[in-house]
Swiss-Prot record:
The keyword Signal applies. GO terms for molecular function: toxin activity. This is Killer toxin KHS. Kills sensitive strains of yeast. Its main location: membrane. Keywords: Cell membrane, Membrane, Signal, Toxin, Transmembrane, Transmembrane helix. Monomer. Optimum pH is 4-4.5.
């Protein structure tokens, strides 16, 4: 019995020691924060799953069966004790993570450790571990350097650390919440040191394989000799990871491109498209430069990284400057102060395109704010959204909303600020990727006076391999203006611009209050609000129509549309297609010559003069434009099925305008049921999305928030 008691006491002591090692969090630097969730050790999980561990655990459990410990304590102690008796590998793990508590300088391992006839060297400046060679076994190659080092060994002109943070998955991508979270959870990380003949390299580590902060892992390895010069010149590569889930990481990694020039690349652990909903960042009065991880460091003359300045609201009726994007210039070699030489300047399209070419997947920022301004009628909201798709994965690469007070805008020669328009032109140019190519783009606006509405003119530009279309926007004096850029070769890529005027103009809607007998008893403001909702719902339906078209889904899938109605619409499309000379003709079905004024009256409650003739005229113009497009040799071919669907969209779009405005004289009785069914389906987003299996892939704008 005394012998068993001694063994039992030793097992308990050693078990407590191991449990402290494997379940406790390792102290970190004063200016770093460890992960919220405790780190798990893969080695321990591996040991516990072995059959020999179970056998030893049962043996210990039988020896301790008569003790006074609880059943849970018995199982825990026996499992640990069984693991100790089963294998000597735990000794290796215990030695590797056996760091003393205290400051960082007191937690370093000894220079060499001999375990199982294998010597593991550790240098003095490695404070938190080192990647082990394969000689110690495959289960011991996951210990990584954790992101801090002695500053004396860093070759940098400045010792400024990297500033980073983590945005939890549950947080909504709203500006205010992210700003408050970032201000309270900023984390400073020092760079990887550069020493002698050892170059530092980066690698991803799974969340359960890290012994320190679970969202940063820097692996130190001597085998990356090809990066040695880069490390010596730049002071070591840096990695910055932001995540929502512990196993889904986003990193900014520096790589070597065969020359001294370095590129900023992005990748994700799960090989999915990166979405900037993960990386919404804001600081007080300053737009955070995402990806600009070398902002304060010297020795990076070869870097030209794109910086993003996110507009943030300072007060309720603030007028925001139109510097939507900024690019940091390379430092002037004559200037000794690297920090001051990296000044900010207004960005251009060429800067952004050149930078995006050096990135695996071009991306920008997404933010959704200004919702509290909805009750201010004097404020105009601008929203720019760019969607990019590769395969079946959708990614929002840019959404920005800017809001301008009407009085301040009116002071700029009655038009929108030229700087904003310039940035809008540049923003649309970021689609100059292998999928899209826009040689030039111009946005024209009209005066914002009360007597004349503003809208965007139609534009159509072609390049060598692609043709870009911009749907001619139909301006509604209260509601919104949409401009859609569409590439016929890549129907899953398009650009949507929304210009919303929250206050009705006097030239149209206010006059209808005097002539509409059914609204004479309604107050003016209430009537305007009703019309605004109606117009906004209509345009929202139109946008969904375009997105519906991009998925090439047939109209017969819409609930409530019978086969006869679908066949009738198909015959209508075939009738238009018959105007083309051959089945292989290039078809472009966009109302490129329609003016905004030509369809503006269809959205009012006043009856149209010669409505049937007006529709026939519009259809004739539409077909003539298609015939002219076929004669252009630079245009690419298009599928006839897609053409029929697009024409159907245009036809139903006009019918919907008449249906909403109660202009039933334009609609025949045969089409009324179809238009009503399609209109109702679009107005009910959940029902409309559930109709098509492919709809969850799309990104929908619902109350100013993008829903995937």
């Amino acid at each position: 019995m005394p012998r068993f008691a001694i063994i039992f006491a030793l097992l308990i002591a050693y078990s407590l020691f191991l449990s402290t090692l494997f379940t406790g969090s390792i102290p970190d630097r004063a200016n770093t924060v460890t992960s919220n969730a405790p780190c798990q050790v893969v080695i321990w999980d591996w040991i516990r799953t072995r059959r020999i561990c179970n056998c030893c655990s049962r043996l210990c459990y039988s020896l301790l069966g008569r003790s006074n410990l609880s059943r849970t304590a018995k199982r825990g102690v026996c499992t640990i004790a069984g693991a100790v008796l089963a294998t000597a590998a735990v000794i290796v793990a215990a030695v590797l993570v056996g760091k003393s508590s205290g400051s960082a300088t007191k937690r370093g391992l000894t220079k060499t450790i001999s375990v199982l006839n294998h010597t593991i060297p550790f240098t003095d400046h490695i404070l938190n571990g080192q990647t082990l060679s394969n000689g110690t076994g495959s289960n011991f190659v996951t210990i990584g350097f954790s992101g801090y080092a002695v500053h004396a060994t860093i070759k940098r002109a400045s010792t400024t650390d990297i500033i980073s943070w983590v945005i939890p998955e549950s947080m909504e991508p709203t500006l205010a919440r992210v700003a408050s979270y970032v201000s309270s959870s900023s984390i400073n990380l020092a760079a990887v040191p550069d020493t002698g003949g050892n170059a530092s390299a980066l690698s991803f580590q799974n969340a359960v394989q890290e012994f320190a902060t679970s969202w940063v892992s820097m692996t130190y390895d001597q085998s990356y000799g090809d990066l040695r010069n880069v490390a010596n010149d730049e002071g070591g590569e840096e990695i910055l990871i932001l995540m929502r889930k512990r196993s889904y990481r986003i990193s900014f990694q520096v790589i070597e491109t065969g020359s001294t020039a370095l590129l900023l690349r992005t990748r994700r652990v799960v090989s999915q498209l990166i979405t900037m909903t993960y990386l919404v960042t804001v600081q007080a009065r300053v737009g955070i430069q995402i990806g600009d991880i070398f902002q304060h460091y010297g020795g990076i003359d070869n870097y030209v990284m794109t910086s993003i300045s996110v507009l943030r609201t300072l007060e309720d009726k603030a007028f925001h400057e139109n510097k939507l994007l900024i690019v940091r210039e390379p430092p002037n070699k004559s200037n000794q102060d690297a920090n001051q030489s990296y000044r900010l300047r207004p960005f251009s399209a060429n800067d952004l395109i050149q930078n995006l070419k050096s990135v695996d997947i071009g991306f920008l920022a997404f933010c959704s704010f200004f919702d509290k301004y909805a009750h201010y009628p004097e404020i105009i909201m601008m929203k720019i959204t760019i969607f990019i798709s590769k395969g079946n994965l959708w990614s929002i690469i840019y959404v920005i909303q800017a809001r301008y007070v009407r009085k301040r805008v009116m002071k700029v020669r009655g038009q929108m600020p030229g700087g904003l328009l310039t940035n809008m032109e540049s923003l649309l140019n970021i689609v100059s990727t292998p999928n899209l190519n826009i040689s030039e783009f111009h946005i024209q606006t009209h005066s914002m006076s009360q007597s004349k509405p503003m809208y965007f003119q139609k534009q159509c530009y072609s390049s060598q391999n692609n043709i870009i279309y911009i749907y001619n926007s139909i301006h509604i004096t209260c509601g919104a203006v949409y401009v859609i850029v569409h590439d016929v070769r890549t129907p899953s890529v398009f650009v949507l611009i929304e210009l919303r005027n929250c206050k009705p103009l006097k030239n149209s809607w206010c006059e209808t209050t005097k002539t509409s007998p059914r609204d004479t008893k309604i107050k003016k403001n209430e009537y305007n609000e009703t019309v605004c909702r109606r117009a906004g719902a209509l345009l929202d339906g139109r946008v969904r129509t375009i997105r519906f078209l991009m998925m090439r889904t047939h109209w017969s899938r819409v609930k409530g549309v019978s086969c006869n109605t679908a066949n009738r619409l198909s015959r209508f499309c075939n009738h238009v297609v018959s105007y083309y000379p051959s089945q292989n003709a290039t078809i472009h079905l966009l109302p490129t010559s329609l003016r905004a004024e030509s369809l503006e009256q269809q959205y009012t409650t006043r009856p149209l003069s010669s409505s049937n003739n007006r529709f026939c005229c519009l259809k004739s113009i539409f077909i003539n434009n298609c015939k002219k497009a076929c004669e252009s040799p630079s245009l690419v071919s298009c599928n006839l099925q897609q053409t029929a669907e697009l024409l159907m969209v245009y036809y139903l779009y006009i019918c919907e305008a008449c249906y909403v405005s109660r202009n039933h004289d334009l609609l025949s009785k045969q089409c009324m049921s179809t238009v009503r069914a399609v209109y109702v389906a679009r107005m009910r987003l959940p029902k409309f999305r559930s109709t098509f299996p492919c709809m969850p892939r799309l990104c929908w704008l619902v109350n100013g928030v993008v829903v995937v």
